Amino acid sequence: NPVPVLPLVELVSTLVTSDAAAAATEQFASAVLGKQVVRCSDRSGFVVNALLVPYLLAAVRMVEAGFATVADVDKAVVAGLSHPMGPLRLSDLVGLDTLKLIADKMYDEFKEPLYAAPPLLLRMVEAGRLGKKSGQGFYSY
């Protein structure tokens, strides 16, 4: 999800961001960088991660509960929702340690259970199974 790769930029306005600065930044991102821009306020996760993190954690919880296998969770999302990859493969790509870090930050700010990292994720990170970057996560690389 680095900015150079994705077509989206989240334009975050703080309490002190002027309308002129936000408008100039949006114009630059759109016209010069060719990005689609969404505006949001300054909160953990902005828009994308506020939606993405609970989704990824829900997939981990499904596997942890024995509801479905890793492969079946990912297959269901790819085939059933037309996503380019499943949530567990995406978690491996992001890095399970990174996912945990983001989830912890969001949970600390909002205290909402949907942001709480599941025990399986904690155990995998503690074991060094961080996903693609370590060669092992939900999948072997």
What are these regions (language model features)?
Residues 18, 22, 48-52:
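Amphipathic, non-transmembrane alpha-helical scaffold segments
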Residues 20-23, 27-42, 60-65, 70-141:
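NAD(P)-dependent Rossmann-like dehydrogenase/reductase catalytic/cofactor-binding core
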Residues 43-47:
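Conserved short loop/turn motifs at secondary-structure junctions
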Residues 50-57, 79:
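Short, residue-level hotspots on alpha-helical faces of the histone-fold
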Residues 9-13:
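Short beta-alpha connecting loops at secondary-structure transitions
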Residues 4-8, 55-56:
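N-terminal alpha-helical segment
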